[in-house]
Amino acid sequence: MKRLIFLSLLTLSSPAQAASTSCLPASVKAKLNYIDKHFGHVIIISTYRKNARIAGSGKRSLHASCQAVDFHIARNKSAAVRWLRSQPVEVITYGCGMHHVHVGVGSYKGHHCVNSKGVRR
C-alpha cells in the first residue's frame, strides 16, 4: 500500500520510470515523500540506469544499483536542499544548466557543475 501512495504523490517523467521507482530504498522514498509534502511537488527525472558511471571518474554510480534518484522540486528548492543536507543521505545539487537534486544512499554532500555532455567543469 505504501508503494502505491508513494507513486501517486510523485510525477514520473515517463511510464518506464514508474517501474524503476519501486527499486529505491525505503529511506530514499521517505525523503522524497517528506519533500513532496513539506516543500513542493517532486518530479522524478531518473532512478535506475544500467551501467551508469559518475561523470569524470568512470566509477559506478549509485543509479546503476537503484540506490539514488535525481529529481526537480516544484517550489522551495533551497529550503528542501537545506533540510536534505541535515539528513543522513547523499545529496548533490547541480549548476551550469543542470538544476536537479540527487539523493542517494551514503553521506556525501556536494555541488557539481556539469555541462550538457555530462562532463564536470
Task: Describe the residue ranges of each PLM region.
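N-terminal signal peptide c-region/cleavage motif recognized by signal peptidases
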Residues: 13-15
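Extended, low-complexity, intrinsically disordered C-terminal regulatory tails
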Residues: 27-57
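Sec-dependent signal peptide recognition
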Residues: 1-7
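Catalytic phosphate/metal-binding cores of nucleic-acid and nucleotide-processing enzymes, i.e., regions
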Residues: 20-26
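Acidic/histidine-rich, surface-exposed loop or edge segments in extracytoplasmic proteins
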Residues: 18-20, 63-64
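Catalytic cores and adjacent binding grooves of peptidoglycan-active enzymes
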Residues: 43, 58-121
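Residue-level recognition of alpha-helix initiation/capping sites
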Residues: 26-27, 75
